[in-house]
């Protein structure tokens, strides 16, 4: 019996150690990088892809930068690349091209050579978007160095300050007599005074006279219409 208890204790202890080792181990191990012969140095591999464009048309001017310019790699004719002699750590891998833009990728290398890749997000640093390894970096589109020339439209013509300065006074002259009661003498005097304040140059025609003539024409027409209606009414009687 004591031997059986000892065996059970040893079995339980082994199970506990196994559970602890499993909890501290990596549940999702990444791919192992190719180790170099000169110590704990590894190789970052991947491929750059530009949809619809031949690699020969843009790879000659493109470079692979690891952590700025600490490590520099070049692209092959098929778009693949390999950056050698990289120690373990966390690095930002980006492809620099004057023709196309690529999203940077962060690669984490453990001391055992396991690789993990994720997108770099400078705004939401806590957000992790896993990427496959070896890297498959696609171009986001061509660079835009110049702004598109704006085309001419009717709104540009109507919103021109010179056009507005010419059109607005005409609208005021045409619509104001229809809105304001021109038969009121006090209202007419106030309008004449306000228009004279806007006309300080004596060489220009007097605005008050123009407004008086304009209102007098409207009042004479209304008076003539009233007289005509009255005469028609007397004739009917």
From Swiss-Prot:
Cytoplasmic side: 178-237
Signal sequence interval, chain numbering: 1-23
Compartments where located: Endoplasmic reticulum membrane
Region (Disordered): 215-237
Molecular function GO terms recorded: carbohydrate binding
One GO BP: tail-anchored membrane protein insertion into ER membrane
Any single Pfam family the record assigns to this protein: EMC7_beta-sandw
Role according to the record: Part of the endoplasmic reticulum membrane protein complex (EMC) that enables the energy-independent insertion into endoplasmic reticulum membranes of newly synthesized membrane proteins. Preferentially accommodates proteins with transmembrane domains that are weakly hydrophobic or contain destabilizing features such as charged and aromatic residues. Involved in the cotranslational insertion of multi-pass membrane proteins in which stop-transfer membrane-anchor sequences become ER membrane spanning helices.
Subunit structure of this chain's protein: Component of the ER membrane protein complex (EMC).
Identification of the protein by name: Endoplasmic reticulum membrane protein complex subunit 7
Taxonomic lineage of the native organism: Eukaryota, Metazoa, Chordata, Craniata, Vertebrata
UniProt gene name: emc7
């Amino acid at each position: 019996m004591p031997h059986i208890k000892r065996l059970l204790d040893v079995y339980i202890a082994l199970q506990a150690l196994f559970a602890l080792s499993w909890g501290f181990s990596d549940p999702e191990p990444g791919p192992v990088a190719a180790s170099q012969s000169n110590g704990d140095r590894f190789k970052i591999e991947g491929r750059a892809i530009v949809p619809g464009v031949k690699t020969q048309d843009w790879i000659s001017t493109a470079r692979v930068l690891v952590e700025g310019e600490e490590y520099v790699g070049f692209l092959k004719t098929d778009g693949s690349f390999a950056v050698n002699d990289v120690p373990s750590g966390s690095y930002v891998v980006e492809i620099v091209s004057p023709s196309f833009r690529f999203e940077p990728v962060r690669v984490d290398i453990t001391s055992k050579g396991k690789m993990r890749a994720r997108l770099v997000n400078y705004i939401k640093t806590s957000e992790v978007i896993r990427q496959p390894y070896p890297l498959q970096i696609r171009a986001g589109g061509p660079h835009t160095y110049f702004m598109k020339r704006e085309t001419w439209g009717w709104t540009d013509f109507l919103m021109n300050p010179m056009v507005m300065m010419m059109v607005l006074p005409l609208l005021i002259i045409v619509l104001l007599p229809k809105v304001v009661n021109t038969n009121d003498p006090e209202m007419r005097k106030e309008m004449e005074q306000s228009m004279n304040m806007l006309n300080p140059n004596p060489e220009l025609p007097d605005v008050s006279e123009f407004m008086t003539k304009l209102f007098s024409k409207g009042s004479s027409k209304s008076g003539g219409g009233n007289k005509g209606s009255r005469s028609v009414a007397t004739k009917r009687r």
